[in-house]
Amino acid sequence: MPCLLPPTQVPEAPSISANNGVLFSSFALLFMFFNSLAISLGSKELYRSSRSCTICSSLIPCRTLIFSLWIDFASDSGASVLVCCFSASLPLVFFFWALFSLSLSFQDDIFLGLYNSGNPVPQLLVLRVPLSLLSTESDVSFSTISPSKSITMVAE
């Protein structure tokens, strides 16, 4: 009697979203490493700029040279508001975004809520990431919700 074996299953090739998720998570880990390294150096140049946030109206010093240059470069645009308020939380956003894009690739959207405890005004950063972002035709929405003001930034 011939031995009937079940058909072998060919493993699926990794999807584009999984590859990009690994890329984003490795970028976030490297970014957090350099962020902590810059904080530990404690150079006065890294703490030289301090701007008033338009959302929480508090002075927040730049913690890294990367964010300092970004705020100086984008001081007249809406990106400086995001960097000013959430400079410490931004690498974590990218890291968790990468983890969720790896594990929840079947979902339509990913919602992340981060409570910013560094500001006197309670605020919530909501990052809405469509998974079609991995193509070039979608956008990312950053919504900041506070008791007094709210701002929505859309980057295409």
From Swiss-Prot:
Compartment annotation: Membrane
Domain of life: Eukaryota
Transmembrane segments: 21-41, 54-74, 80-100
Topology in membrane: Multi-pass membrane protein
Broad class of where this protein is predominantly found: membrane
Keyword check for Transmembrane: yes
Gene Ontology CC terms: membrane
Keywords: Membrane, Transmembrane, Transmembrane helix
Note: Partially overlaps RBA50.
Name the UniProt record assigns to this protein: Putative uncharacterized protein YDR526C
Source organism of the structure: Saccharomyces cerevisiae (strain ATCC 204508 / S288c)
Lineage: Eukaryota, Fungi, Dikarya, Ascomycota, Saccharomycotina
